[in-house]
Amino acid sequence: MTAALHIGHLSKSFQNTPVLNDISLSLDPGEILFIIGASGCGKTTLLRCLAGFEQPDSGEISLSGKTIFSKNTNLPVRERRLGYLVQEGVLFPHLTVYRNIAYGLGNGKGRTAQERQRIEAMLELTGISELAGRYPHELSGGQQQRVALARALAPDPELILLDEPFSALDEQLRRQIREDMIAALRANGKSAVFVSHDREEALQYADRIAVMKQGRILQTASPHELYRQPADLDAALFIGEGIVFPAALNADGTADCRLGRLPVQSGAPAGTRGTLLIRPEQFSLHPHSAPAASIHAVVLKTTPKARHTEISLRAGQTVLTLNLPSAPTLSDGISAVLHLDGPALFFPGNTL
């Protein structure tokens, strides 16, 4: 199967400062990939290189087997068959919704029967048929993003690129528009690359996630694999919360840390030193005895919150603060037992 997108050893610098460093990845037809990372990691620059707005220093890019960038090739933006959607849609204020979408077909008119049929199909797909005669200033932010998506899909591009398209919307609207937009992409069978800083968004909607740091891809994997089997400590902490401790491996599949001896997930040899990471949801709290892999603690303070209970406790010389979705009623100062559900992650060489 030919990849919808293939990037090979792509690099880009600005004023001798590397921004993209040997980026390689592929995208299957119909697949939705999220690229996540801290601000300045290079994710938007990567998207702009794919679209043709920036020229890489080296590497290759191909769409459905056709080279659009290499040492000897650099197709202009209009010939790349890509849709590009940014934070605020960037609609033409003097054109109606209908004509904004028609502009995606190249002439802004939508006069032929085939063009009208395509525009009407995109209006229906994105749920904005009743808005066809309105102007951008008459639309909400969410409606404008729907129009921008319809315009991007109108010419039937090989790939859709989306640069944090929901970040300017409020939380409730963002959730609805995000779900509708993902559904529209899947209904149209389109491959898409999202740039996002929202890891929860990526975990929920991506087929695969690429984690970037300082111009490099740390790991590309399914949401489940990335969360459960991160390649390194940086990827683990970016994709989810974690409580970390220096630790040393034992021969029996455990590691010694400040909380005691705990089971770990690692193939490193005994004696290896590194960092142990526990996901917060792995902890459960019991007022009395609990199964193996338990930690004796003293409750310092419990604070009920809207969706969880915040519990501060001391285990040995270590003070922990946990947000537990449900917890037994515990008085401050009472002894309790923390149970660890499943092995902790262990990363050799990552010492704190």
From Swiss-Prot:
It catalyses: Fe(3+)(out) + ATP + H2O = Fe(3+)(in) + ADP + phosphate + H(+). Keywords: ATP-binding, Cell inner membrane, Cell membrane, Ion transport, Iron, Iron transport, Membrane, Nucleotide-binding, Translocase, Transport. Its main location: membrane. ATP binds at G37, A38, S39, G40, C41, G42, K43, T44. One of its GO terms (cellular component) is plasma membrane. It holds the Pfam family ABC_tran. The complex is composed of two ATP-binding proteins (FbpC), two transmembrane proteins (FbpB) and a solute-binding protein (FbpA). Part of the ABC transporter complex FbpABC involved in Fe(3+) ions import. Responsible for energy coupling to the transport system. Belongs to the ABC transporter superfamily. Fe(3+) ion importer (TC 3.A.1.10) family. This is Fe(3+) ions import ATP-binding protein FbpC.
